[in-house]
Amino acid sequence: MLMKRIKYIFVLMIGVLLLSGCGKNYKPITYTKFIENFNDSEKFYVTDDTLKYESIFERFIEVNGLNSEFTYMEFKTESEAKKYVKTNYKNNSYYKYKTSGNSIVITSNQNKYVYGVQVDKIFVIGQTPNKKYKSEVNKNMSKLGF
């Protein structure tokens, strides 16, 4: 009887741990923090293309590296950001699209690796044309808080 109760408590604890990772709430990142993350490294070249896209975005920053690239898009409103992500990623079978807490997360593992997160009016996407550099994308997205 005691062993059954211990097993039950153990299984319950494992279940709680597994479920606690679901629905993660990300925090929006500022463009200055985004730029600082990549300015520290000589591997990346940062370009602020906001003026080129000012009719669509509040901020548009691209970071290009040897093996990966990252884009920071700050929309004028959260609804514009969600619409952009849904239009470009939700109905495309190439991407996995899921809502997680207060954000939308997209990934793809076909041919190239893509990892993007939309929080509030911010959408950040990292990608690499070669899946063997997936860890570089994940490492930098993790540094950004995703």
Model segments located where?
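Alpha-helical hydrophobic membrane-insertion segments
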Residues: 12-15
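A short, solvent-exposed beta-edge/loop patch
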Residues: 96-146
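Bacterial signal peptide processing site
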Residues: 23-25
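Alpha-helical context
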Residues: 10, 57-61, 113
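C-terminal motif of bacterial Sec signal peptides marking the signal peptidase cleavage site
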Residues: 18-21
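Bacterial N-terminal signal peptides that target proteins for export
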Residues: 2-10
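Short, solvent-exposed recognition patches
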Residues: 32-108
